[in-house]
Amino acid sequence: MVFFTCNACGESVKKIQVEKHVSVCRNCECLSCIDCGKDFWGDDYKNHVKCISEDQKYGGKGYEGKTHKGDIKQQAWIQKISELIKRPNVSPKVRELLEQISAFDNVPRKKAKFQNWMKNSLKVHNESILDQVWNIFSEASNSEPVNKEQDQRPLHPVANPHAEISTKVPASKVKDAVEQQGEVKKNKRERKEERQKKRKREKKELKLENHQENSRNQKPKKRKKGQEADLEAGGEEVPEANGSAGKRSKKKKQRKDSASEEEARVGAGKRKRRHSEVETDSKKKKMKLPEHPEGGEPEDDEAPAKGKFNWKGTIKAILKQAPDNEITIKKLRKKVLAQYYTVTDEHHRSEEELLVIFNKKISKNPTFKLLKDKVKLVK
């Protein structure tokens, strides 16, 4: 956006607001641009569409600003608008609109955006006028490329030098030249994609070649192994050429035999350890049978010899040994089960079944009396 200063009052004004300012400030005859400092008399300010940037202003003498593609297109678009104003067949309403449009430097170049811009900035909502303005623009833009093509065409037909050269040059070189021209025309993305495809193809080809070589190398080895097996089965000796392969097979067999022997030794050691552990457990669990009372004969209720376990007799014997014929259920259970394990040896039941039997024997027998956590022998 271009800004001007009034030389009469010194007020800074946008390009769009100049007409309003002229109607207010009567002495306004000359306007000067804030950026470049040029003076514009009368209506000359309308042609000053774009000014220098801050980089160009403060960059020094040798500074050259970069030209943006969008700015070049915008300038061409605004020039087209100024050319359309001069046409005789344009209606006065449309001409006024075109004059207002030429004051802007950000005019859209597409129909939908252009019409929205007209509605917002110029407050034109009549669709017929909007269509008329756009049709004039589209006609002007379509007529330009036709004129350019006519200017570019040569007046006299010139002989094509490439045709004469192609007759002399061989076909292979011509193809290469055509491919090079096609590569030049392609975009950077297309070139990149082609390179990636070529690399992928090369990788695939290398993989296939390596795979084929490996398969060729593996086949003769398999055949040699098969021949050796056949010779061994027939009882024939392996030839000297294949002596190394025979030695390897023998070594493998020896290793397998030694490994099996070691496994057998380890298994035997483990069994011995388990047997010793079981014996130690049984020794720990063993308890001495209750001793006979002094000066008397052994009773019938005491624990019997190994074989069938006498629950009632063992419980009675343990209670008699206890002070006041009374003992806690926990201690009694421990002693009875220990005695059970010593009698039955290996053929004993699970702990759950033993606990159930123990509880039944205590609760149902009238000779045993339960007092909370203790058991007492009733005489």
UniProtKB/Swiss-Prot annotation:
User: Which tissues and organs express this gene's product?
Assistant: Predominantly expressed in testis.
On this chain, the residues bearing Phosphoserine are: S215, S244
Binding residue positions for Zn(2+) 1: C6, C9, H21, C25
Task: Summarize induction of expression.
Answer: Induced by MYCN. Induced by interferon-beta.
Instruction: Output compositional bias ranges, type Basic and acidic residues.
Output: 173-196, 203-216, 256-265, 276-295
State a GO cellular component annotated for this protein: photoreceptor outer segment
Which segments of the protein form a coiled coil according to its record?
Answer: 175-219
**Cross-link position, Glycyl lysine isopeptide (Lys-Gly) (interchain with G-Cter in SUMO2)?**
K14, K207
Main location, first listed in the record: nucleus
Q: What GO MF terms are annotated?
A: DNA binding; DNA-binding transcription factor binding; identical protein binding; RNA binding; transcription regulator inhibitor activity; zinc ion binding
Q: Where does Zn(2+) 2 bind?
A: C33, C36, H48, C51
- Where does this one sit in the cell? Nucleus; Nucleus, Nucleolus; Cytoplasm; Cell projection, Cilium, Photoreceptor outer segment
- Acidic residues bias: where? 229-239
GO terms of biological process kind? erythrocyte development; innate immune response; negative regulation of innate immune response; negative regulation of transcription by RNA polymerase II; positive regulation of phagocytosis; positive regulation of transcription by RNA polymerase I; rRNA processing
Zinc finger spans (C2HC LYAR-type) are 1-26, 28-52
Give the span(s) annotated as Disordered. Answer: 161-307
PANTHER family from the xrefs? CELL GROWTH-REGULATING NUCLEOLAR PROTEIN, CELL GROWTH-REGULATING NUCLEOLAR PROTEIN LYAR
Q: Describe the function of this protein.
A: Plays a role in the maintenance of the appropriate processing of 47S/45S pre-rRNA to 32S/30S pre-rRNAs and their subsequent processing to produce 18S and 28S rRNAs. Also acts at the level of transcription regulation. Along with PRMT5, binds the gamma-globin (HBG1/HBG2) promoter and represses its expression. In neuroblastoma cells, may also repress the expression of oxidative stress genes, including CHAC1, HMOX1, SLC7A11, ULBP1 and SNORD41 that encodes a small nucleolar RNA. Preferentially binds to a DNA motif containing 5'-GGTTAT-3'.
- Share the domain note from the entry: The N-terminal zinc-finger domains are required for the appropriate production of 28S rRNA and the formation of pre-60S particles.
Oligomer status and interactors? Interacts with PRMT5; this interaction is direct. Interacts with GNL2 and RPL23A. Interacts with nucleolin/NCL; this interaction is direct. Interacts with phosphorylated IRF3; this interaction impairs IRF3 DNA-binding activity.
Stated name of the protein: Cell growth-regulating nucleolar protein
* Source organism per UniProt: Homo sapiens
